[in-house]
Amino acid sequence: MRLNTLSPAEGAKHSAKRLGRGIGSGLGKTGGRGHKGQKSRTGSGVRRGFEGGQMPLYRRLPKFGFTSMKSAVTAEVRLNELTKVEGNVVTLETLKAANILTKDIQFAKVILAGEVKSAVTVRGLRVTKGAKAAIEAAGGSIEE
């Protein structure tokens, strides 16, 4: 077997539709576009959500909500990521230094995911109840 002798399995590839190549092809004349109308013309069609001039659904419904900018600068930190920090004190700065958080993150919360094996001191970060219990069970502490 050589690369130049490889070919797809029989029936695996379908031949392309050749539009406008005579009546016998089944796709001659109108080429599968039907007769007349906006969608039969070349370079034409309607945009997404267009309903023929009727007020479209996305404009009939009221606006709602917004995206909080605080969510863009907030991150979650798993328990097993705390072990990647050098030393046993975990702060926002040490997490950034260990490449766990990006430099634009301003707030972080330690969540109960993974395991913490060594005693660590978490300083200045928010911590969930479960994560707090796990850190204290491993001999660590949480400082505000």
Curated annotation (Swiss-Prot):
Keywords, sorted A to Z: Ribonucleoprotein, Ribosomal protein, RNA-binding, rRNA-binding
Keyword RNA-binding: yes
GO terms for biological process, alphabetical: translation
One of the record's GO cellular component terms: cytosolic large ribosomal subunit
Region Disordered, residue ranges: 1-52
Assembly with partners or alone: Part of the 50S ribosomal subunit.
Similarity section: Belongs to the universal ribosomal protein uL15 family.
Protein name in UniProt: Large ribosomal subunit protein uL15
Species this chain originates from: Haemophilus influenzae (strain 86-028NP)
